[in-house]
């Protein structure tokens, strides 16, 4: 305790700021010096632990009120609320207004109403929508967005909308248009987006975009239109949504896409500058003319998707500078809902792809099943990848006994390798 007391106030504040606010308050019992130090903490985190009993929630309410009113930090860097069904819009509005007076920079609200109570969503106060100092806003679950026409977040750089409710069809578009310097957007349409079937993300300053469907809604028919020319990171995981990328994205570097899509060429066209690409993609059309991903050096493909053989060949032909190729199985349940697949056969490219001849140096296959077509792919890559340094294979343990897995993997040792320095790693 004496050693801690010798630390500077600034360092102590950094330490206690990482704790839940209820634990921070307890520190005032440690010494006279700490009695008022907790009031200067710039990060406040409140969690009612999904309290269902109104009387206990009343205590939590008073505790939050007191903690926020007594706080003396010049700037509240973070204010976070994780609340359950007893919390009301009025409670949240009061706390938000106090936070705005205290120059709040980041606001996070997660509200879970509970399945056994009447629907009680959280509505945000209108004054928040024109708060000029907010830099980060994260909203989750049953939070309603009723966005006014005059919405303006001139400082907002990060926005997370996870399973929120949109009051009108215009709410999301109006909100995004009021964020002129937004750099990061996370959008999860699960459960509560029934008013909105078409999402428009048209933000010239956006650098990072994640569009998710964590619930895996099969009744989909959602359309996402993205126009973000400054985008560098793009993550799209929605097997039943439709994605339209407008114009080229010359700055994009890292892309992860999981979707059932009819035309991969149309989907990936605006992403030609990508350097790292992860695909769980089920094309429903035959891929012919290849594209040119001149900067692509790292590719990950899901070997669990329908017609992935064609996609593999197409990507090898389209990626002349590819250095890393990883094949995996994502075990997505969504693949179970596809029509019965036709029997697939892998066909070798008409000519050896440039990436195999000159650049590929890492090849990895996770959950290798040692099927006939898989063996053809492995044999072809090992036979033609002249610069290959490592080839790593791990067997699908859920399908075969250990002895059989070892036997299948050991067969790879006898396959011809174009690279004399290639190291074969078997797991």
Curated annotation (Swiss-Prot):
Residues 345-395 form the FBD domain. It comes from the Eukaryota. Disulfide bonds: none annotated. Gene3D superfamilies: Ribonuclease Inhibitor. InterPro entries: F-box-like_dom_sf (IPR036047), F-box_AtFBL13-like (IPR053781), F-box_dom (IPR001810), FBD (IPR006566), FBL13/AtMIF1-like (IPR050232), LRR_dom_sf (IPR032675), LRR_FXL15/At3g58940/PEG3-like (IPR055411). Residues 1-53 form the F-box domain. SUPFAM superfamilies: F-box domain (SSF81383), RNI-like (SSF52047). It holds the Pfam family LRR_At5g56370. PANTHER family: EMB|CAB62440.1-RELATED (PTHR31900:SF34), F-BOX/RNI SUPERFAMILY PROTEIN-RELATED (PTHR31900). This is Putative FBD-associated F-box protein At3g50710. It comes from Arabidopsis thaliana (Mouse-ear cress).
